[in-house]
């Protein structure tokens, strides 16, 4: 019986090996692309019309005016169309799979690219396509997508895509809308410097590692529940942010320089693993919509001309706090009460409004005596200036303040230690402001 089993197993291995050899050898040599081959005319592409599968990296360039790759269903390698400055259109509508990357780059008069059957590709790069108006595909699987410096008005070629590693869309000045059914983003979702009326819709997205939005007009993330790393909104024309299902942000949460922003709605958000930064949003008079936020793992930094800050459920800030309003109507009472109870655990606590300031230096002894503090409080009647975070000021402040944050799994952040005597008069930049640099640099 054992002998029969051994013979059967050996026969199966031999059959599998022969099948693999047969499969490999079934691809004719004419369908194998040499390492330095470049197609510069349609006749070069026609040579592959009898191939179901191409093996190698296909590069297209030169003086080709219109191009078509007919009948090929699979490329075991990459497809690159580069610097074909006379090319106006390209089609490969039989192509279903590219094991490596699809690259369309520096095609100055290309108006359309059609890959109607393409379902699987490792990465897509559409870069410097100033005349393109349409890109067609049926992508269901892609790890990385980069779309930069094109004239696309909408991104419609990814309507079947459910998961992605990187989705980066930047510097597409005519872009007005992006709507995607993506459900998970394992690395980063980034939109920046596109058309100033761009609308972003990712209503099926449930989880993302990192999201960064810059120069966006409106956003919709109806089902987003968790951000493993950071979430940032920098310099947008958004009027409201509604993320009612979001409950956890693993690291930094930044809302900076959104002049038209008036409303926040993060009613289910309970934990921020890193810092919370809300700064220089000139239209945001009342900062609310954070009703269930209980824990901030880093520092709390809020700067602007707001009249109220509602953080009623907040129990713990593991870093320091720097809250400064230009409005004389803003009250520091709630934050001072939280600090006195030991809820703000960092070395510094600064709260200012247009009429007064409260600054506290915590003694080193306090950290070893169950959060008992020795505090020196100074008050001033001079008017507070709204901080303007220029790159020069931020970098200078950053050298005086450092913030460490653990990985996405632990999601913790500690405030800077060292010479942190925060007894700054109103209008003087405190070292904690340096935190904003690290935040902006980390998400851009």
UniProtKB/Swiss-Prot annotation:
Present with 11700 molecules/cell in log phase SD medium. A lipid is attached at residue 419 (GPI-anchor amidated asparagine). Residues 359-418 are annotated as: Disordered. This is Cell wall mannoprotein PST1. Extensively N- and O-mannosylated. It comes from the Eukaryota. It is a lipid-anchor; GPI-anchor. Induction: Positively regulated by cell integrity signaling through MPK1 in response to cell wall perturbation. Induction is dependent on transcription factor RLM1. Keywords: Cell membrane, Cell wall, Glycoprotein, GPI-anchor, Lipoprotein, Membrane, Secreted, Signal. GO terms for cellular component: cell periphery; extracellular region; fungal-type cell wall; fungal-type vacuole; plasma membrane; side of membrane. Residues 1-19 form the signal peptide. InterPro entries: CWI-Assembly_Regulator (IPR051648), Rcpt_L-dom_sf (IPR036941). Coiled coil: none annotated. Glycans are attached at residues 57, 76, 83, 86, 196, 210, 228, 235, 242, 263, 268, 280, 292, 305, 329. Residues 359-381, 395-418 have a biased composition (Low complexity). GO terms for biological process: fungal-type cell wall organization. PANTHER family: RECEPTOR PROTEIN-TYROSINE KINASE (PTHR31018:SF3), SPORULATION-SPECIFIC PROTEIN-RELATED (PTHR31018). It is found in: Cell membrane; Secreted, Cell wall. Has a partially redundant function to ECM33 in cell wall integrity. May be involved in a repair mechanism activated in response to cell wall damage. The lineage of its organism: Eukaryota, Fungi, Dikarya, Ascomycota, Saccharomycotina. Belongs to the SPS2 family. The keyword Membrane applies. Mannoprotein called haze protective factor from wine that is able to prevent visible wine protein haze formation. This mannoprotein showed haze-protective activity against wine proteins and BSA when either was heated in white wine. Residues 420-444 form a propeptide.
């Amino acid at each position: 019986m054992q002998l029969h089993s051994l013979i059967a197993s050996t026969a199966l291995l031999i059959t599998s090996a022969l099948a693999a050899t047969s499969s490999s050898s079934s691809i004719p040599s004419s369908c194998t692309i040499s390492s330095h081959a470049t197609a510069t005319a349609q006749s070069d592409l026609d040579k592959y019309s009898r191939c179901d599968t191409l093996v190698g990296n296909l590069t297209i360039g030169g003086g080709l005016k219109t191009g078509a790759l007919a009948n090929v269903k699979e490329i075991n390698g990459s497809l690159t169309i580069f610097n074909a400055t006379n090319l106006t259109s390209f089609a490969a509508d039989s192509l279903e799979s590219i094991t490596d990357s699809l690259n369309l780059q520096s095609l100055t008069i290309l108006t359309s690219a059609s890959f109607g059957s393409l379902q699987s590709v490792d990465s897509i790069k559409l870069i410097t396509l100033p005349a393109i108006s349409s890109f067609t595909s049926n992508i269901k699987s892609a790890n990385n997508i980069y779309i930069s410096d094109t004239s696309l008005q909408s991104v419609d070629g990814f309507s079947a895509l459910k998961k992605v590693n990187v989705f980066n869309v930047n510097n597409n000045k005519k872009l007005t809308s992006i709507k995607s059914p993506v459900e998970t983003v394992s690395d980063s979702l980034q939109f920046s410097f596109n058309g100033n009326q761009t609308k972003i819709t990712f209503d099926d997205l449930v989880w993302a590692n990192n999201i960064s939005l810059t120069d966006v007009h409106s956003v919709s993330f109806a089902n987003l529940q968790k951000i493993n790393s950071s979430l940032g909104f920098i310099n947008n024309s958004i009027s409201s942010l509604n993320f009612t299902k979001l409950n956890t942000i693993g690291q930094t949460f930044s809302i900076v320089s959104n002049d038209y922003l008036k409303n926040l709605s993060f009613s289910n958000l309970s934990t921020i693993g890193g810092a919370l930064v809300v700064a220089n949003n000139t239209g945001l008079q009342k900062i609310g919509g954070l009703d269930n936020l209980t824990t901030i793992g880093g520092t709390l930094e809020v700067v602007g001309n707001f009249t109220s800050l509602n953080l009623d459920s907040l129990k713990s800030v593991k870093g320091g706090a720097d809250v400064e309003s230009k409005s004389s109507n803003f009250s520091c009472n709630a934050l001072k009460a939280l600090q006195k109870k030991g809820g703000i655990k960092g070395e510094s606590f600064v709260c200012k409004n247009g009429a007064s300031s409260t600054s506290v230096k915590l003694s080193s002894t306090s950290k070893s005596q169950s959060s008992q503090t020795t505090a020196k409080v100074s008050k001033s009647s001079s008017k507070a200036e709204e901080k303007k975070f220029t790159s020069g000021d931020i970098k200078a402040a950053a050298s005086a303040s450092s913030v460490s944050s653990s990985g996405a799994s632990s999601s913790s952040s500690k405030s800077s230690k060292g010479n942190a005597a925060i007894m700054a008069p109103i209008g003087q930049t405190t070292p904690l402001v340096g935190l904003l640099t690290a935040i902006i640099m980390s998400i851009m």
